[in-house]
A protein has these predicted regions:
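Conserved, well-structured core domains of diverse proteins
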Residues: 1-59, 558, 565, 574-576
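Low-complexity, highly charged intrinsically disordered N-terminal segments
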Residues: 26-99, 104
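Short, glycine-/Ser/Thr-/acidic-enriched flexible segments
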Residues: 31, 39, 69, 103-105, ...
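Flexible, glycine/charged-enriched surface loops at secondary-structure junctions
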Residues: 60, 64, 86-91, 274-278, ...
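A non-catalytic, amphipathic alpha-helix used as a structural packing/dimerization or gating element
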Residues: 68-76, 226, 263, 312
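Active-site-proximal beta-alpha core segment in soluble small-molecule metabolic enzymes
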Residues: 89-282, 287-292, 303-308, 316, ...
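Short glycine/threonine-rich loop-to-helix capping motif typified by GTGT followed
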Residues: 251-259, 290-308, 338-353, 544
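Charged (often Lys/Glu-rich) extended helix/loop segments that serve as interaction or gating elements
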Residues: 314, 318-629
Length: 629
């Protein structure tokens, strides 16, 4: 079997062609390669990038961003809508709007603004985001103001309108209109308004509460009608130019998009009949990405392409306006996840491994407890009895032995042999089970969870991939090197935090999703590094400082001809910064260190040396040192 391993086998094992979308590949040296311009562009070895970053003073864990992927994703999105508009002879245009909540990093926003030129806009959902957008948006470009708004938010948005931006204030709740009317008069500026309608249609998935009747935002049908009446009474009906709705986030099934569009177009038709001069339809978010590469309706996948998504939206609007004899509205999408997810990879190093027992039978003691003798009898019958019977019997004796140990009736040495015997049986049983046998599948799942190594990884799930903990999000993971070697172990990844949730339970592989990941045995003196891919959407913003692990080091890698350059490097958070954030007085800490050194009776050079070491700990990286090159 080992002779059959090659680079294609590695691609298949880690499902790289399916989730990589042309941006990720494996070269003949077994290195992960990143192609920022897609499959036809130059590729760069991720291990080489990491080594160069370390040479320039950066440390692991390391967030590696590829800004050129952002531009490529935007171009794909714009191209898909241009194609659909042409095929359907649609008279309206299209603008891609980026909701900066997905990733507010200035470099991300600036890259997309530069790449989008005039066919691009920004969305803000809060006052801080609006302040960033007012400075970053191109003059004359579209800006969408979503989220709940107070008078100050609306005043700031109207100031942006005076400054030449096409700012649409989207009414999310009825009370916002009062602030709009008051502030518009005070500033002597005519607003551009939108209305967010709350669709009954809802897509299945982990983010379904962002759409549908139970959605947090948007107006009900009665509230929409009341808004139109109030605008008419205030002489502002002509300012309502935009209809907005949100079908959900990471919509997996293209049929859900079609259903949502069917309902949304009815709102457009009905509002137009009421004399509302709508000329923009903002379909919000929902365009997903295929994290697991299965092209399915799984929550972490999608069963459609960007082209199919664009065609579904354009077709829905084209058919609606044609049947009603209406003017085709301009289309806006807020597909932030699809723009940003692929552009970032978190590179982490394995600091240690806890391996499961290899399966050899420990020698018997003359006075061995009965529970151990029973397990040996099970082992002796491996070749003569059905494997499921043996597995269930072994589980029974394991639980019996664990109970005896808790009652003080089994020694620590006997407790250790209990585990060794059980794992010897479990390994043998696992080899005799087949996933083709339906009756074997539950036992296989249990054994696959038990018979895996623990790989201790130098990072925090809560800081770097918080959606793994929060919503069981799946991100593709693979070793970044040694992929020309067949992995001989299976493992689960656990992080540095003192929390049982600081682990990854599900992994992308060739068959979809599994409870463990194929990995290599560690080599003495050689770093073993993994890439956690597609972390460019939401993860940096949602990251949590559990155990005071802060932001990691980061580097932006930009294509420069046939090579690459580091466009920007950022050192991660230090311990003093994290302690200051949670209210510690740093100088008081230093004074305390000196006082404790003196109280311990230490003075002179030794005292100074200890203080220097403590101070270095205070100003150091919050993560572990890698220790090998």
């Amino acid at each position: 079997m080992a002779n059959a391993w090659n680079i294609d086998a590695a691609r298949h094992t880690y499902a790289v062609p399916y989730w990589g979308d042309g941006y990720v590949d494996i070269n003949d040296a077994g290195h992960i390669v990143i192609r920022p311009h897609g499959s036809g562009g130059p590729g760069f070895s991720l291990p080489d990038i990491v080594e160069r970053a370390r040479d320039e003073g950066l440390r692991l864990p390391l967030l590696v961003r590829f800004p050129d992927i952002l531009a490529d994703r935007l171009a794909r999105l714009q191209g898909a809508f241009a194609k659909a508009i042409g095929e359907w002879h649609y008279a309206g245009g299209y603008t891609a709007v980026y909701p900066i909540k997905v990733n507010q990093q200035r470099g991300v926003v600036a890259e997309l603004v530069a790449a989008g030129a005039q066919g691009f806009g920004l969305e803000a959902g809060s006052k801080p985001e609006l302040m960033a957008v007012l400075a970053m948006a191109r003059p004359g470009s579209i800006v969408i103001c979503n989220g709940y708004k107070d008078r100050e938010y609306i005043r700031l948005a109207l100031i942006g309108r005076k400054l030449g931006l096409r700012i649409h204030i989207v009414i999310e709740k009825p009370s916002e209109l009062d602030h709009v009317i008051t502030e518009a008069k005070a500033l002597n500026v005519e607003p551009l308004l939108g209305v967010r309608v709350r669709l009954a249609s809802i897509g299945a998935g982990k983010w379904q509460n962002t759409g549908g009747d139970k959605g947090k935002f948007g107006l009900s049908p009665a509230q929409v009608l009341n808004l139109v009446t109030r605008l008419d009474q205030a002489g502002l009906k002509h300012t309502l130019k935009l209809q907005h709705f949100h079908m959900g986030s990471q919509i997996s099934n293209v049929r859900d998009i079609a259903n949502g569009m069917r309902e949304a177009t009815r709102y457009f038709v009905e509002l137009t009949r009421l004399g509302v001069p709508l000329d923009i339809v903002d379909v919000g978010g929902g365009l997903g990405v295929d994290y697991e590469g299965s092209r399915s309706r799984s929550h972490n996948s999608i069963n459609y392409s960007i082209e199919q998504y664009a065609a579904t939206i354009v077709q829905s609007l084209a058919e609606a306006v044609e049947s009603e004899g209406l003017q085709a509205p301009h289309i806006i999408t807020e597909a932030g996840r699809a723009m940003t997810a692929h552009h970032a990879v978190m590179v982490v190093n394995v600091s240690d491994v806890e391996t499961v027992p290899v399966g050899s039978l420990p020698p018997a003691d003359r006075d061995e407890p009965a529970v151990l003798r029973h397990l040996r009898e099970v082992h002796d019958e491996l070749d003569t009895r059905p494997p499921l019977e043996l597995f269930h019997e072994a589980q029974h004796h394991l639980q019996e032995g664990q109970a005896l140990y808790a009652l003080g009736q089994l020694s620590l040495a006997a407790r250790a042999r209990l585990d060794e015997l059980f794992y010897a049986i479990a390994n043998a049983v696992r080899a005799r089970l087949s996933p083709a046998e339906r009756s074997h599948r539950q036992a296989l799942d249990e054994l696959d969870e038990k018979l895996v190594d623990k790989y201790f990884v130098n990072f925090s799930v809560f800081e770097s991939i918080p959606d793994v903990w929060a919503i069981d999000q799946i991100f593709p993971i693979a070793p970044i090197a040694r992929l020309h070697e067949q992995p001989t172990r299976r493992g689960v990844l656990v992080d540095l935090t003192c929390d049982s949730d600081g682990r990854i339970d599900n992994y992308v592989d060739a068959e979809g999703v599994d409870v463990s990941l194929p990995l290599h045995a560690l080599k003495e003196g050689e770093a073993y590094r993994l890439g956690i891919f597609m972390v460019g959407a939401y993860q940096e913003t949602l990251g949590d400082i559990h155990n005071l692990f802060g932001d990691t080091d980061a580097v932006n890698v930009r294509v420069d001809g046939g090579n690459y350059v580091f466009a920007h490097k950022r050192r991660g958070d230090t311990t003093d910064l994290m302690l200051d954030y949670v209210g510690y007085d740093l100088e008081a800490l230093r004074r305390s260190y000196r006082e404790r050194i003196a109280a311990a009776g230490i003075d002179g050079e030794q005292a100074e040396g200890l203080f220097v070491t403590l101070n270095e700990g205070l100003t150091g990286y919050t993560y572990l040192s890698e220790g090998v090159r």
